[in-house]
Amino acid sequence: MTNNSAPKLSPQLAPAIASAILGGAPLPTFDATMTLDEAYGVQHDVLGLCAPEGLAGIKAGMTTPASQSFFGIDKFLLGGICPKTVQASCWAVPFRAGRLIECEVALRVDGEGRPIACAPALELVSLNFARETDMNATNLLAANLGAEFIVLGEFQPWRDEFADLAISLSHNGMPVNSGAANDALGGPSLSAGLICSEARVRGYDMTPDLILMTGACGQVVPAEKGQYEAGFGVLGSVCLHIN
């Protein structure tokens, strides 16, 4: 009899992913096909190894119809923010090939999932797959959506005008991206509730003071050497140096 069974999910996958993330190494190969539920399970194991002290926040990814269509899914995905990956504005980081930079809105919410504070933010993402064929939604989800670093500006008490922010990103003084706060999941107010609701369904520990990252505003651009500054109108700005 011919054995046509698909490769089974290895219990060593989560430790291998965590080791790669912590060491800045390429991800392991992904030989088994996962469902979204299985991928979230692997991600939770990965986060338990990368951040045993608990998460600093939760990030949303695949927050636009275009990104969902590209990966063949019909809803946004979530990842965890490890405490040691959160940096203050104007932080400097060594260059790493293949890294991407996103403009995002960072939130803190109340117990009902309503925004109470907001900050400008940049996210550095590294999709460090060993094989191009491994790049799909469930593998990316298992690998925590490629989250590498979060760079935060100053939080301000929530104001309704933050829902309509225009956002711009410059690299060495030249514009490289523009967008709006409502590019991601319809804007901060709507995204806060959506992220909190999905996070509870997916088993994240919703502790007080979590940072919520609402998704990319505008385009995702390659992170090159130099100085980046993102302006968020009345919310302020956030900067990053890549050496």
Give a label for each model feature.
Residues 6-187, 192-194, 201, 221-225, ...:
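Catalytic-core "active-site belt" of small-molecule-metabolizing enzymes
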Residues 178-179, 207-208, 214-215:
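Thr-Gly-centered strand-to-loop micro-motif
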Residues 207-209, 225-227:
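Loop/turn positions that initiate beta-strands
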